[in-house]
């Protein structure tokens, strides 16, 4: 399986203006994140103290990754980077 580092940031213009609405939305989103962590779909997740940016480690196919991130669009923007394990990188280096 391919491993991805997914960084994300909130789109300010798409965030609810009222704090009560923001809390409700964020709690709903966090339920899906916690479910993905429990199921193993996400390997790790972190969020900055301001709640406006963070990261996730996802392992799977490109399609599964797209399906996971699309549920948060247009509220968040994502950048995905394919990651190699240490062993994979050693293999690359040995074949240079």
Where do the language-model regions lie?
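Short S/T/G/P-rich N-terminal loop/turn motif that feeds into the first structured element of a domain
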Residues: 1-53, 63, 84-96
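Helix N-cap motif at beta-to-alpha junctions
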Residues: 58-64
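Short active-site oxyanion
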Residues: 52-55, 77
């Amino acid at each position: 399986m391919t491993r991805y580092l997914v960084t994300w940031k909130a789109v300010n213009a798409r965030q609810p203006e009222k704090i009560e609405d923001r809390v409700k939305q964020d709690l709903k989103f966090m339920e899906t994140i916690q479910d993905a962590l429990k199921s193993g779909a996400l390997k790790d997740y972190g969020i900055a103290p301001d709640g406006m940016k963070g990261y996730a480690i996802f392992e799977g196919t490109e399609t599964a990754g797209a399906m996971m991130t699309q549920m948060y669009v247009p509220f968040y923007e994502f950048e995905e980077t394919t990651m190699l394990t240490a062993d994979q990188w050693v293999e690359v280096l040995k074949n240079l």
